């Protein structure tokens, strides 16, 4: 018949402080471990992961319909025809940087509908 975890806890609860210290010493010796507190890890690991709030929209490839992509880029960026054409032809290129997630997703949708390959970073 084995002793359950609850029985062990009840047994330890009934011990005096000196008996618990002796029990800890005996367990350290028996199992070859130390009951010393573990060294804290780096503080950066404890910090919460910060949610990204600014995104970049990058034109990866033009696709088959270059004219539609140029029109979409002009509408989204406010660039002139020549500037938009140069930007599209220099793909991969950043179209907009530091915009909200909703704006980035909307821009990505418009450009993909025009036939472009787009990435939100």
UniProtKB/Swiss-Prot annotation:
This is Large ribosomal subunit protein bL12. Keywords: Ribonucleoprotein, Ribosomal protein. GO terms for molecular function: mRNA binding; structural constituent of ribosome. SUPFAM superfamilies: ClpS-like, Ribosomal protein L7/12, oligomerisation (N-terminal) domain. Belongs to the bacterial ribosomal protein bL12 family. It comes from the Bacteria. The keyword Ribosomal protein applies. Forms part of the ribosomal stalk which helps the ribosome interact with GTP-bound translation factors. Is thus essential for accurate translation. It comes from Erwinia tasmaniensis (strain DSM 17950 / CFBP 7177 / CIP 109463 / NCPPB 4357 / Et1/99). Homodimer. Part of the ribosomal stalk of the 50S ribosomal subunit. Forms a multimeric L10(L12)X complex, where L10 forms an elongated spine to which 2 to 4 L12 dimers bind in a sequential fashion. Binds GTP-bound translation factors. The keyword Ribosomal protein applies. GO terms for biological process: translation. One of its GO terms (cellular component) is cytosolic large ribosomal subunit. NCBIfam families: L12 (TIGR00855).
């Amino acid at each position: 018949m084995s002793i359950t975890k609850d029985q062990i806890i009840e047994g330890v609860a009934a011990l005096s402080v000196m008996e618990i210290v002796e029990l800890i010493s005996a367990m350290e010796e028996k199992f070859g471990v130390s009951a010393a507190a573990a060294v804290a890890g780096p503080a950066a690991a404890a910090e919460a992961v910060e949610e990204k709030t600014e995104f970049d929209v990058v034109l990866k490839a033009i696709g088959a319909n270059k004219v539609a992509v140029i029109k979409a880029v002009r509408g989204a960026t406010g660039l002139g025809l020549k500037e938009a054409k140069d930007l599209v032809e220099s793909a991969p290129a950043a179209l907009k940087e530091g915009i909200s997630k909703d704006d980035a997703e909307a821009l990505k949708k418009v450009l993909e509908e025009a036939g472009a390959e787009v990435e939100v970073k």
